[in-house]
From Swiss-Prot:
Domain of life where this protein originates: Viruses
InterPro entries assigned to the protein according to its UniProt record, in alphabetical order: DUF5854
Entry keyword annotation includes Coiled coil: yes
Lineage of the organism: Viruses, Varidnaviria, Bamfordvirae, Nucleocytoviricota, Megaviricetes
Species per Swiss-Prot/TrEMBL record: Acanthamoeba polyphaga mimivirus (APMV)
Ranges in a coiled coil: 41-76
Keywords, comma-separated and alphabetical: Coiled coil
Protein name in the entry: Uncharacterized protein L421
Length: 209
């Protein structure tokens, strides 16, 4: 039986091939499962992508709509402010520094603060103030805003052994809890020492005791 060794060899080879085939089949099944998951993921990602595109388009449309409304409001506000400025200035006649007065009127009308400037002054109120008091009022308001936004301010207490302390410029109490602190401008001229372009306030924090 000279063919017997060959038969055994081929049988062994078939067994080996069967094992290799099974291994490859397992690998193929695993890959197909991964591909199925990947396809699902791709489909989900495509859905998410399409939704994001739609959301972006809607947001862009909303943005354009809001920008248009804002532009209309700005134009309306500018018209009202300009009309108020013209009416007020016309009542005063010749004013030495018309540009500064214009800026101060606009600042008082357009700048809101719940405590310092809870409502804009009326045209009649501005006319009653007069040019100099309008500038003083605007400069004082602006200086107080700078004080609130530039803290903490360092000062010495005139009680408790002249303790060094800080005040944030906003609250009614300093760092140590005392209510003695206030912003002193007694040595300053609000008419000339500050403008609406200054970055730092005039005056200093001071103990009131």
């Amino acid at each position: 039986m000279e063919n017997l060794p060959k038969i055994n060899h081929f049988r062994d080879l078939i067994k080996t091939l069967n094992i290799q085939i099974k291994n490859k089949q397992h690998g193929l099944i695993s890959i197909e499962k991964q591909l199925s998951v990947a396809i699902d993921n791709v489909e989900n990602l495509c859905l998410i992508r399409n939704k994001l595109k739609t959301d972006i388009e809607n947001l862009l449309e909303n943005k354009i709509d809001v920008e248009n409304k804002l532009l209309v409001l700005r134009n309306q506000t500018e018209y009202i402010v300009s009309s108020t400025v013209k009416t007020v200035v016309k009542k005063f006649g010749v004013v030495p520094d018309i540009n500064r007065l214009d800026q101060c009127i606009r600042y008082l009308i357009m700048t809101f603060h719940p405590i310092l400037n809870p409502r804009k002054p009326t045209t009649d109120e501005l006319i009653k103030l007069g040019p100099e008091k309008i500038i003083l009022k605007a400069h004082e308001f602006y200086n107080n805003i700078l004080v609130m936004n530039s803290g903490p301010h360092v000062f010495f207490h005139t009680h408790d052994n002249y303790q060094l302390c800080e005040w944030d410029g906003k609250s009614t109490k300093c760092k140590c809890g005392s209510t003695c602190v206030f912003w002193c401008i007694e040595e300053c001229n609000l008419l000339t020492d500050i403008s609406l372009s200054c970055k730092n306030p005039i005056g200093y924090a001071k103990c009131g005791f």
